[in-house]
Amino acid sequence: MGKTLIFIKLSSLNECIKYSTIISKIARELSIHKGNELYIWVSCSEMCQKRTKHLFRELQNALCELYLSSATTNDSSLLSVVPTIVLFEYWSNIQLGSITDSWNSVYYSENAKDQILNIPAKSFQSIGPDVLNEIHNIEHLPKKDESEDSGKEINNMVSAVGGTFDHLHVGHKVLLTLTAWFGVKEVIVGVSGDELLKKKVQKEFLENIQKRKEEVSNFLHSIKEDINCRVVTIHDPFGPTITDAEIDSLIVSEETKTGATAVQEERVKRGLPELSIYCIDLLYPAQELNLKDNNSLKVSSTAIREELAKLAYKNK
């Protein structure tokens, strides 16, 4: 039990696909015992580049690939998913030494060998080029159509996102990381209050509002040291998005994007500037590509609550 580090150095974020199988394998082994944690450190100079819609798509795909691959367990139980944090050198401003004094294990790509020399750990294991070549060939990936404005710079500074954030899982982590990437100046997260959760499935297994807010705040500070964030309780579908003039971007998922139109309309009524809307596709690329060797679980808060309900019934 303890903390495990996967240190990968990439020339491009789209190379994350090469590491899917090895991450799944490591996560599966770690899931056998409770108390393990997994950190994935990505060293990629693309994170130093100016923010564009193209880089947004690259980052989104990389996060989905890494987090979905980590949601692999030995017993196919969502409750066994190993807590995982993806960090980016040149963006997170996190020092590896601040996470732990000694790592249980460090897995590293061959090109990162010089960078892991001073990392204290009980064991080291290289995941070299010949291993990676057997996993995936990046050239075989389907290419996403690039729009004409893919190179357009993103200037948003204050981002907002809303949700239940119950039993914080890998999908939430993708959403929150991207919201943090957009919110250079400030990140505002609206967490649904009890009055918005009356129709939730297995609602008796929902975490309380304080727990959900704490988990969101802790996660945001764990991925970016200098982040400026506000985590607030929302009592209606809008929250601060229709009252705060400084918010300039709204991050939504496929499940919540219908609410973005209502937010825009309400802001116009109140004389507030319209927001940039960014929709996160949490299914790409691991599920979209239907990779045969990717055994990641389909994670959702509802599925976690249903599993907790079954466990509670079994233990009666």
Swiss-Prot record:
GO BP terms: coenzyme A biosynthetic process
SUPFAM superfamilies in alphabetical order: Nucleotidylyl transferase
Source domain of life: Eukaryota
Cellular component, GO, one term: cytosol
Pfam families in the cross-refs: CTP_transf_like (PF01467)
GO terms, molecular function: dephospho-CoA kinase activity
Family to which this protein belongs: To yeast YGR277c.
Protein name as catalogued: Uncharacterized protein C1F12.08
